[in-house]
């Protein structure tokens, strides 16, 4: 890359090894790199609880930027994160859904407001340490989201709702690397502290993974006991609030039924948790809405794909069928598609994303509504 071709890129630096190496690799490739860390921890909450945006993480990101010789800034995104991610997360659980806050954060925060800030700074690209790959057709200009070399770390599921414009201004420097190689490369470059940091496993704003206590603290008046019922409406016992349960759950129900019972779903209006036996947890179909298409402009007729119903779920053969005049269906956000699986899937969970693949490419995805 010549100086006249030098591009400016903003790297979202979380203080972890992946984003640190994303910045390092881009600088080595000749980009003008600016490191930015988003401060998103809830206002009034503890600032240093070990999450990706804690004071410790910000200090780690600043230290890495200094070692790399790049500028580093911290942007206060607390309000936008609180209103668009934490409120969404809380309200979804209170509505009987099991949300995925990372997909909402990527849509609204990282590739929404953060990308706009990066562009306002004159950056050509936004880069992150995600394990994913962006490809572009040189003739049509269409961008594609593809699985990375390290398929175990594949994060394309979390990125299915990126638009064409967002993908055109996105770089994923780790696309062709294995995670263990990234750690080795970080150590070789003297980034010893971040090279040894463990992978984050929990939701970033709930480091102890106790989402029930988190929601209870924010909305105690909305969590009320109610009845466990079967599909016929027969009362089986009492539950301690809808947020304590998710589809497919068996343990922690707090009631003995004489046989294994599993959560099948919720009657939110009646504040009821619907239970059934294991075989009832499986289903061949789901409905999805709030759709985003990447590899194609849209779906006009049946389309055969592989589908993933949660982040670490295996890919499953399926057919997408668009439903006509579906915008008025309960829970619809725009058009709705029916997804028919070749084999039944366990615990299809409203609120989660379903993401569609063909080969290595992400076709698109949407939010499961039933």
Curated annotation (Swiss-Prot):
Q: Signal among the record's keywords?
A: no
**GO cellular component labels:** cytoplasm
Residues of the active site are 105, 204
Q: Which InterPro entries match?
A: MnmA-like, MnmA-like_C, MnmA-like_central, MnmA-like_central_sf, Rossmann-like_a/b/a_fold
Identify the residue position(s) of the site Interaction with tRNA.
130, 352
**Disulphide linkage map:** 105-204
Region described as Interaction with tRNA: 153-155, 310-311
Gene Ontology molecular functions: ATP binding; tRNA binding; tRNA-uridine 2-sulfurtransferase activity
Gene3D superfamilies cross-referenced by the UniProt entry: Adenine nucleotide alpha hydrolases-like domains, HUPs, Translation factors
Q: What is its EC number?
A: 2.8.1.13
Where in the cell? Cytoplasm
| Main location as per UniProt | cytoplasm
* Annotated GO biological process: tRNA wobble position uridine thiolation
Q: Does the keyword Endoplasmic reticulum apply?
A: no
Reaction catalysed by this enzyme: S-sulfanyl-L-cysteinyl-[protein] + uridine(34) in tRNA + AH2 + ATP = 2-thiouridine(34) in tRNA + L-cysteinyl-[protein] + A + AMP + diphosphate + H(+)
UniProt keyword list: ATP-binding, Cytoplasm, Disulfide bond, Nucleotide-binding, RNA-binding, Transferase, tRNA processing, tRNA-binding
Give a short account of what the protein does.
Answer: Catalyzes the 2-thiolation of uridine at the wobble position (U34) of tRNA, leading to the formation of s(2)U34.
The family note in this entry says: Belongs to the MnmA/TRMU family.
Q: What is this protein called?
A: tRNA-specific 2-thiouridylase MnmA
The taxonomy runs:
Bacteria, Bacillati, Bacillota, Clostridia, Eubacteriales
């Amino acid at each position: 890359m010549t100086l006249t071709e030098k591009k400016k890129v903003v790297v979202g630096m979380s203080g972890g090894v992946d984003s640190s190496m994303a910045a390092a690799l881009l600088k080595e490739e000749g980009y003008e790199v600016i490191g930015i860390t988003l401060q998103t921890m809830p206002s009034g909450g503890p600032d240093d609880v070990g999450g990706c945006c804690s004071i410790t993480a910000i200090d780690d990101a600043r230290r890495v930027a200094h070692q790399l010789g790049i500028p580093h800034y911290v942007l206060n995104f607390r309000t936008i994160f609180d209103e668009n991610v934490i409120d969404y997360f809380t309200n979804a659980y209170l509505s009987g859904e099991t949300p995925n806050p990372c997909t909402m954060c990527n849509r609204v925060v990282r590739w929404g407001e953060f990308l706009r800030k990066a562009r306002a700074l004159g950056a050509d690209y936004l880069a992150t340490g995600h394990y994913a790959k962006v490809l572009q057709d040189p003739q049509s200009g269409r961008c594609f989201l593809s699985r990375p070399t390290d398929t175990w770390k594949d994060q394309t599921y979390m990125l299915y709702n990126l638009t064409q414009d967002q993908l055109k201004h996105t770089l994923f420097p780790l696309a062709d690397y294995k995670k263990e190689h990234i750690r080795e490369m970080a150590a070789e470059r003297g980034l010893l502290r971040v090279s040894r940091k463990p992978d984050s496993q929990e939701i970033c704003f709930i480091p102890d993974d106790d989402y029930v206590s988190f929601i209870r603290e924010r909305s105690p008046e909305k969590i009320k006991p109610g009845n466990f019922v079967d599909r016929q409406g027969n009362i089986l016992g009492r539950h301690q609030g809808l947020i304590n349960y998710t589809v497919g759950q068996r343990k922690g129900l707090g009631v003995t039924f004489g046989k294994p019972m599993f959560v099948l779903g919720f009657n939110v209006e009646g504040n009821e948790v619907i239970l059934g036996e294991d075989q009832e947890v499986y289903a061949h179909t789901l409905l999805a809405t709030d759709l985003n298409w990447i590899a194609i402009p849209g779906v006009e007729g049946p389309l055969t794909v592989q589908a993933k119903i949660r982040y670490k779920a295996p890919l499953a053969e399926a057919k997408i069928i668009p439903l006509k005049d579906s915008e008025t269906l309960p829970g619809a956000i725009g058009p709705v598609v029916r997804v028919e699986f070749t084999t039944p899937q366990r615990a299809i969970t409203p609120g989660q994303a379903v993401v569609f693949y063909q080969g290595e490419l992400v076709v698109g995805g949407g939010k499961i509504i039933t």
